[in-house]
């Protein structure tokens, strides 16, 4: 998607890889023009950044050990569990808000969180559902729990843009709409689901 936006703008794409919790800071300080990292357009973030039209309606799930499927069937069973989530993300804030008695382990890398789950250091990892399904599909000892927390409405993933840059937002919106309309974005999703295991 970033390449398609760069092509539309007629500029060379420069991608900076960083931990999720540094992404929005880099945008805010002017080190980046756009942030595309599975960022939910929350009301809190909208006060600081502009956002494109949504490109993905996110679903968030708990990845657990398959042997614990019967153990974690409702929110009460997760109330005092040790839950890992990626630092600075909506899944992390959902655990803080909806499971305040749970022991939260905030990590910068999803692969690390899954390793902690498999080694028994945490009981569950709260993450984007497509990523959770991919991990479960490739690791016979893992499964996606049937219980989930409540997503707030309107918190779809969108491209974050520095506040007030309406010209850039207009171009980004146009590109996203085109990618969704012509089926290219669906192809991106399919490729992404195959790549989620690379970091593990």
Give the role of each language-model region.
Residues 66-74, 105, 164-170:
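Short helix-loop capping/hinge motifs at secondary-structure junctions, enriched
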Residues 39-48, 94-97, 118, 123-153:
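A ligand-binding cleft/hinge motif common to bilobed small-molecule-binding domains
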Residues 90-105, 143-148, 176-200:
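Ligand-binding clefts/hinges and TM-proximal coupling segments of bilobed small-molecule sensing domains
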Residues 5, 27-28, 78, 117-118, ...:
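Hydrophobic residues within well-ordered alpha-helices
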Residues 1-38:
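Extracytoplasmic small-molecule ligand-binding "clamshell" domains
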Residues 57-64, 129, 133-177, 193-200:
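Periplasmic-binding protein-like
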Residues 14-25, 70, 90, 105-115, ...:
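Short helix-initiation/N-cap motifs at beta->coil->alpha
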């Amino acid at each position: 998607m970033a390449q398609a936006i760069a092509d539309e703008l007629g500029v060379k794409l420069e991608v900076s890889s960083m931990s999720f919790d540094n992404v929005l800071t880099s945008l805010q300080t002017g080190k980046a023009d756009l942030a595309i990292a599975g960022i939910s357009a929350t009301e809190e973030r909208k006060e600081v950044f502009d956002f494109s039209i949504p490109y993905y309606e996110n679903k968030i799930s708990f990845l657990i050990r398959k042997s614990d499927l019967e153990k974690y069937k409702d929110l009460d069973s997760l109330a005092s569990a040790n839950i890992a989530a990626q630092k600075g993300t909506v899944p992390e804030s959902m655990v803080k808000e909806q499971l305040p008695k749970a022991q939260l382990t905030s990590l910068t890398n999803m692969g690390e969180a899954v390793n902690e789950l498999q080694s028994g250091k945490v009981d569950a990892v709260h993450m984007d559902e497509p990523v959770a399904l991919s991990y479960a599909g490739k690791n016979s000892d893992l499964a996606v729990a049937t219980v989930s927390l409540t997503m707030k409405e309107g918190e779809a993933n969108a491209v974050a843009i520095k506040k007030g840059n309406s010209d850039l937002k207009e171009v980004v919106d146009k590109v996203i709409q085109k990618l969704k309309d012509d089926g290219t974005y669906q192809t991106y999703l399919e490729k992404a689901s195959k790549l989620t295991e690379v970091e593990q």
